[in-house]
Regions:
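Beta-strand/loop-dominated core regions that host nucleotide or nucleotide-derived cofactor-binding catalytic loops
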Residues: 2-28, 39-98
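Short coil-to-beta strand junction motifs in C2/discoidin
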Residues: 35-36
């Protein structure tokens, strides 16, 4: 699998009622862009510790915005399913394209 994106998690929802492990996460991409079908495989804490997670991106809604006057970055919400384990706000998520 090729790396497709690195994104920083801003917030995430509890699983939707009746939809099992379906979760909506709010993030901005630090590198690349997430697409439907991408696999979330690694979460990295701010101090560099990696955690294995497993999720598949089911839906992506992106918009461009500025961060501290820098170039626009892709930001938005991702609907995904899987075992996101210990994922927390502020962690980076590495996605791969199968």
């Amino acid at each position: 699998m090729a790396e497709s994106a690195i994104a920083r998690l801003r917030a995430w929802s509890d699983p939707r009622p009746g939809e099992g492990s379906l979760v909506e996460i709010d993030l901005f991409c630090l590198d690349g862009r997430l697409e439907v079908g991408d696999v979330l495989g690694t979460a990295v804490t701010p101090d560099g510790i990696e955690h294995a997670i497993r999720g598949e991106v089911l839906e992506v809604r992106f918009f461009d915005h500025m961060i501290d006057g820098l170039d626009p970055v892709f930001s938005g919400r991702v609907l995904c399913t899987g075992n996101l384990g210990p994922l927390r706000e502020g962690w980076d998520v590495v996605a791969s394209r199968p």
